A protein has these predicted regions:
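Short acidic low-complexity segments
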Residues: 31-44
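Glycine-rich, N-terminal phosphate-binding loop of Rossmann-like dinucleotide-binding domains
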Residues: 52-53, 133
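Predominantly a Rossmann-like dinucleotide-binding segment in NAD(P)-dependent oxidoreductases
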Residues: 105-193
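Short, Asp-centered acidic motifs that coordinate Mg2+ and/or phosphate
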Residues: 10, 48, 128
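Short loop/edge segments at beta-strand edges and connector loops
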Residues: 36, 74, 103, 181-184
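Beta-strand-loop-alpha-helix segment that lines the small-molecule cofactor/substrate pocket
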Residues: 46-48, 54-55, 59-106, 121
């Protein structure tokens, strides 16, 4: 998508062949830097990073960037443990750098329209809300995005990645949840797990 006021200055990926494709496509003026080492990229003169790496790496990579003096836009979710969340918050507070989690679901056209109506006052005050996010995928599609049992998507409880469901209510109403309850149906045996936080 087009975004004014920004310039793609550097890209980091563990796979050099991917970097070559990106450089060929986006290095229009010959200044795009490419790195296979994230720490080396952080030494460069860039202002901010966009983290689109694996879920379980987000907090570590964000904290490194903040401590290197970079602003951070992180794909969701921000962390995989409470301890990582605390460390991430501390890094933001200590560095004074801007951090944003890039939860995209609240910014779809439908949710933006609901927010407009809610902000107008037509709906009144929100006292209770429910949200859901259903993303059914075939086994082949699931394997494409999570190949193998050791892929991060297969190593976390499903409710750890609940941002699509809850972020839309938080954004529309500009509120924080008091209590959250969730369950994950199991397609294979139709059982489910319930989590409450």
């Amino acid at each position: 998508a087009e975004c004014t006021g920004l310039k793609l200055a550097a890209v980091c990926d563990r796979r050099p062949e991917k970097l070559a494709v990106i450089k060929a496509k986006y290095d229009t003026d010959g200044t795009l830097m490419t790195f296979t080492d994230y720490d080396e990229m952080l030494k460069s003169d860039i202002d901010a990073v966009i983290l689109a790496n694996y879920f379980n790496e987000h907090a570590e990579f964000a904290i490194k960037a903040l401590r290197a003096g970079k602003h951070v836009l992180s794909e969701c979710t921000a962390m995989s443990t409470l301890a990582e969340g605390v460390a991430l918050c501390r890094a933001v507070e200590e560095t004074g750098k801007i951090y944003m989690i890039a939860e995209n679901y609240p910014y779809t056209k439908q949710r933006l329209e609901i927010k407009r109506v809610y902000d107008s006052g037509e709906l009144g005050e929100m006292l209770y809300g429910e949200a859901e996010y259903c993303h059914p995928m075939s086994n082949n599609t699931t394997f494409k995005y999570a190949p193998g049992e050791y892929h991060w998507r297969n190593q976390i409880p499903s409710t750890y990645y609940c941002t699509h469901a809850i972020a839309q209510i938080m954004h529309i109403t500009d509120t924080m949840p008091v209590r959250v309850n969730g369950f994950v149906p199991r397609i294979k045996d139709q059982s489910y797990r319930e989590y409450e936080y």
